[in-house]
Curated annotation (Swiss-Prot):
The gene is slpH. Residues 1-30 form the signal peptide. The keyword Secreted applies. It holds the Pfam family SlpA_D2. It comes from the Bacteria. One of its GO terms (cellular component) is peptidoglycan-based cell wall. It comes from Lactobacillus helveticus. InterPro entries: S-layer_prot, SlpA_C_lactobacillus, SlpA_D2, SlpA_N. This is S-layer protein. GO terms for molecular function: structural constituent of cell wall. It is found in: Secreted, Cell wall, S-layer. The S-layer is a paracrystalline mono-layered assembly of proteins which coat the surface of bacteria.
Amino acid sequence: MKKNLRIVSAAAAALLAVAPIAATAMPVNAATTINADSAINANTNAKYDVDVTPSISAIAAVAKSDTMPAIPGSLTGSISASYNGKSYTANLPKDSGNATITDSNNNTVKPAELEADKAYTVTVPDVSFNFGSENAGKEITIGSANPNVTFTEKTGDQPASTVKVTLDQDGVAKLSSVQIKNVYAIDTTYNSNVNFYDVTTGATVTTGAVSIDADNQGQLNITSVVAAINSKYFAAQYDKKQLTNVTFDTETAVKDALKAQKIEVSSVGYFKAPHTFTVNVKATSNKNGKSATLPVTVTVPNVADPVVPSQSKTIMHNAYFYDKDAKRVGTDKVTRYNTVTVAMNTTKLANGISYYEVIENGKATGKYINADNIDGTKRTLKHNAYVYKTSKKRANKVVLKKGTEVTTYGGSYKFKNGQRYYKIGANTEKTYVKVANFE
């Protein structure tokens, strides 16, 4: 039986809203304890076993004006722990006295005094992870996917991106602190949106495109892609007739795009270039937290666009399109006796049925057609059968004998006489056999 994971916190809470279990009342000075599943399995990130990601929200203080009273700053947030493919979260209390906020000069700052557009470091002390006594003595590594998050195992240690700890006799891993750097206090009075602009024209853009040639080995370097994007686009907020630049991490965006396409990158940043790929560049304002994303299409002209092998097939029964989950896509269909370009082989989807993927202009479309509407299904007659043209007329004088294997196409048709028939014969002729003859 698995144990629910709870997060309890000294810097965190008098009352913690913990998912997926009910809220748990704790004394204000309780240490942060995370109760995890009983079996420790490695995180998908091989660098650490438990992924801890704090999320901190800071609001800047607003000075008194003629139109509004002074508003103090505030700090709220949560700590999430990802373990064994599941995520669990505990909320930090507003303006927790146990959490320490420091500015760039390492001066301690009260939540009420937070200023906009300044980077702060938030330190949450006494964090523990409870994996149960059955894991006592095991060694685990704790880390975070967020590069701004660091940990200290003991008081006086230098913060590190990962820490290796040995569980005590109760299966508990104890940390001296969790630190979150680059926390920006949001100015709630500043309403300007973030937009991307073309460097040359100054025009606002919602999509982008760059072209880069690969080297003679068909490779690109991440730095080349980053430079191409950064030289063509910038992000900014417009206010009081002026633009204020908003920074964005293009390198991480490029790496994420390559990872999504399962393209390997060498230790020095080289990768085998595809003909085209899309980089989603996100810019977030440190002043008011607003953001914008610019999808940039990167084209590599001297790398051939790969063509998916395909074949032409005749549809023998009206066919709808389906997605990879075997769910119908829209109402469009390919009518019988028309041809369609499909992949060379069928694919078995989630429902266990074989489908052909539709190919258009040498590209896989992600749309599928039931293979039964193209290749048919072989069935054995249980009775002698005539071949019909209509419900009343036979197509010919042929009598199909019991035990004969016949290929039928698609689902059955209901004729005017109320009986159901299968289409047989890989042709455009009206040739049908009663379904009852196969039962």
